[in-house]
Amino acid sequence: MIGDMEITKGEDIKSYALEVGYKKQEKDLFRVSIVDKELNQEQIILRNDAGVFVVTPSLNQIFKFEGNWPLNSPKPYLLQSIVEIAQKKEAKVEKEDDGYLVSSRVHYPNNKNFYREEIMFDKEAKVKWLQIYNKDDVAELKIAFKKVKYDAPIKDTYFDVPQTLDKKASVSAIQEEDLPLYPMMLHGAQLTNTSRMNINGKVKHVLEYSGDANFTVVQMKKDSVEKTQTVIMPGQMIDVLDMVGFYDGNHVSAIYDNVEFTVFSEDLSPDEMMSVITSMQVAVMK
């Protein structure tokens, strides 16, 4: 399936090109490509017989995870999730001139704002578009599918992990001088201290928060490596559509626009720590 995806966070709207491939076999194969149109940065998530991989050409790195992605939680762009929603008992189906409109309450564990979803199918039951709304009935996610083929023949090599990555020219919106970014999602905490550390020529920015929940944010600009690297990632992968993070013990890390964000906390859940990181995309606060 090929389409365009829009994610709205407050006044910020991000546009992505989306391509999803799936092949059913003893161990199902998946490939999801998400390209940030503004930054021209691509991230590919693969599942094959060797495991789960997040391919990040802008850093020339491949991250390998354990786990059952993507079937461990629903994903709006997955046909399996779309069908599951359409088949819910409480789903409402309305016949339209050009197909069928399905509407249902939804629950996405990694996207707690998502409340209600509409899915439009054509007369041949091919999905045309979907929109997900929050409790205020504001659309936070839109996907318009341009090409949909069920049971299309796909070669196994489509799901192979690339040995070398093509570092396409990309635009980085976040520069070193923009750091640190400040999260909007604070979980009842307030900023109590900021500091900088210089480690091996790299600057790490540290933000400490205290209150209902205590947590620390560390952020650092990442440089692309010369030779393609595969990095084995410990812990649990967390996928929030436009960003992939991993949880290991008391912290969650994620890379966005070549900046590595890490949240340390004994009080926040993995999803709450990830929500702190994703809230930094909305605005640069000084």
For each predicted feature, which ranges?
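Short, surface-exposed coil-to-beta transition loops
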Residues: 13-18, 39-42, 112-117, 139-142, ...
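Beta-strand-dense domains in secreted/periplasmic systems and polymorphic toxin scaffolds
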Residues: 32, 130-132, 263
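An acidic-aromatic
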Residues: 21-76, 134, 138-147
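A short, Trp-centered hydrophobic/proline-enriched beta-strand micro-motif
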Residues: 1-13, 30-32
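Flexible, processing/modification-adjacent segments and terminal tails
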Residues: 47-111, 115, 154, 159
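Short, solvent-exposed recognition patches
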Residues: 162-257
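Gly/Pro-enriched, hydrophobic low-complexity segments
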Residues: 97-163
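Surface-exposed amphipathic alpha-helical segments
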Residues: 137, 144-146, 150-154, 262-286
